[in-house]
Amino acid sequence: SEPQXGRDAGGAL
């Protein structure tokens, strides 16, 4: 996900 999405808070865009 995004740097701070709310779900995983970090991933591959």
Curated annotation (Swiss-Prot):
This protein's record includes keyword Secreted: yes
GO cellular component: extracellular region
Any single GO BP term: chitin catabolic process
UniProt-recorded Gene Ontology molecular function terms: chitin binding; chitinase activity; chitosanase activity; endochitinase activity
EC number from the UniProt entry: 3.2.1.132, 3.2.1.14
Alphabetical keyword list: Carbohydrate metabolism, Chitin degradation, Chitin-binding, Glycoprotein, Glycosidase, Hydrolase, Plant defense, Polysaccharide degradation, Secreted
Subcellular location: Secreted
Catalytic activity: Random endo-hydrolysis of N-acetyl-beta-D-glucosaminide (1->4)-beta-linkages in chitin and chitodextrins; Endohydrolysis of beta-(1->4)-linkages between D-glucosamine residues in a partly acetylated chitosan
Coiled coil: none
Domain Chitin-binding type-1: 3-13
Post-translational modification: Glycosylated; contains galactose.
Function summary: Has insecticidal activity when consumed by D.melanogaster larvae. Has low chitinase and chitosanase activity.
Name of the protein: Insecticidal protein LA-a
Protein source organism: Morus alba (White mulberry)
